[in-house]
Amino acid sequence: MGAYRYVVADVFTRTPLTGNQLAVFTDARGLDGETMQALALEIGFSETVFVLPPEQGGTARMRIFNPAAEMPFAGHPVLGTAFVLGAPLQRGVIELETGAGIVPVTLERDEHGALVFGRMSQPVPTVEAADEQVVLAALGVERSELPVELYDNGARHLVVTLASEAAVSALQPDLPAVDALQVTGLNAIAGSGGRWRSRMFWGHGEDAATGSAAGPIACHLARHGAIRWGEEIVLEQGVEMGRPSILHARADGEDSRISAVEVGGSTVVVARGEFRLPDAPL
């Protein structure tokens, strides 16, 4: 082992110190899974990424860890890693190998060549009905405006639709009950047309910006007629945490069948550092 450099990025925002935090180790060769998990716990962000050489023809392979476990797929780590790698590589498309397959991210630059936006093609999720009473009880509400369903794109997300943004903002879920649902996240949304508010809860708290949920939310709204297939929505998340985030999402399909999912947003790099592990020279 040796000294391992990392980048800290704020994802789904253009403003430093907002959005969702992410640490990216840009060259994780030599680290085993146990050490990666320990580093993710040490950093304490919702996710930490370790970049490795590709194995399936992509630009790079990535392993994603939250403080407790490895994850096959998560949205804000994919977008943030594409920004971190895209700047030095000067590529228009970054293809990241994840546990859920290869995820391409198309990067957009301004007139000065700086990265300003990225769009990822997400895995098409499977959909199944959820136990509505159990889910609503965990969230602390009595009803959902649309059916409560579970979407699985490598991450497992429940979606509940409330009547107003104020109702979303006022939520105080039962986190042990949320944890017992055994999902990546329980998402509550409200809005209309192209603008929606969202909050995502998991067993130990709340997430500031959830890219793996944004695509399923667009799918959910299109499947149930709240928006048109192919219509892009803008999701605002993280407000109640003091980390406002903006996510763009779009789903293509017909009737209730999903054919493609795209999620986009911006990222800003806010810090760089280095971990020196026990046998690294001081």
Regions found by a protein language model. Give the residues of each.
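Active-site proximal loop and beta-alpha junction motif in alpha/beta enzyme cores
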Residues: M1-F73, V78-L282
